[in-house]
Design a protein with these regions (language model features):
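Extreme N-terminal basic, low-complexity initiation segments
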Residues: 2-6
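Extended, charge-rich alpha-helical scaffolding segments
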Residues: 8-173, 177-180, 185-193, 197, ...
């Protein structure tokens, strides 16, 4: 026992050490926040709405992109190089919409399982992929609610769980989402396939 005489405080090193060890192990400092189902569920529902809005905007943009590509291919001579560049952008948006759809379904699932999430200490095995994918995607997609969702899962399951999700340790991320949100450009074959399909549909 150490007595800090200036303020009359008795410090018990063992108790403090145990408290800090628990906080370090989970990556949670209770003084600054903690898991709250009342915060997580509304954020999941808001994310679902945000994904739906983003999907609709992307879909409308893609329709315009398709018309622009068709016009470039119909010119005499066809402006194939410009059309090819536009097609890459179209493919990226197409991939993004597909990833959004999967992430939206994941948020809906987690919202329905909020009671289970709240009452367990470890992440349920059948939710590891959905939760890890949401955490991983929070740093990539422009859906602000995912930041708070990621924070709540860090409070609930610990910083190690969050870090493993961010690094995709053990391949926990949904493979389709990982592919669709990859920074790698689409293959030349895929771009050509899109161009041919657009040309056929706008003859």
């Amino acid at each position: 026992v150490t007595v800090v005489r200036s303020i009359g405080l008795i410090v018990r090193p063992r108790a403090i050490s145990g408290h800090l060890t628990a906080a370090t192990r989970t990556g949670i400092m209770p003084l600054f926040g903690g898991y709250k189902a009342s915060k997580l569920k509304p954020q999941l529902k808001m994310a679902v709405t945000r994904f739906q809005i983003a999907e609709n905007k992307k879909s409308a943009l893609m329709k315009q992109q398709i018309r622009d590509i068709a016009r470039l291919l119909a010119e005499d001579p066809p402006k194939e190089e410009k059309a090819r560049i536009r097609a890459e952008g179209l493919i990226r948006d197409d991939y993004m919409v597909e990833a959004y759809e999967i992430l939206q379904l994941s948020c809906e699932l987690l919202s329905e399982r909020i009671q289970l999430i709240t009452h367990v200490k470890e992440c349920p095995p059948d939710l590891v992929e959905s939760i890890s994918t949401i955490i991983w995607a929070s740093a990539i997609v422009d859906i602000p609610e995912l930041i708070e969702i990621r924070k709540q899962f860090r409070y609930k399951f610990g910083k190690t769980f969050e870090e493993e999700a961010m690094m995709n340790v053990g391949g926990v991320i949904n493979e389709r989402v990982a592919v669709k949100l990859s920074v790698q450009p689409p293959s030349a074959y895929l771009v050509q396939t899109y161009l041919e399909k657009i040309a056929d549909e706008h003859e």
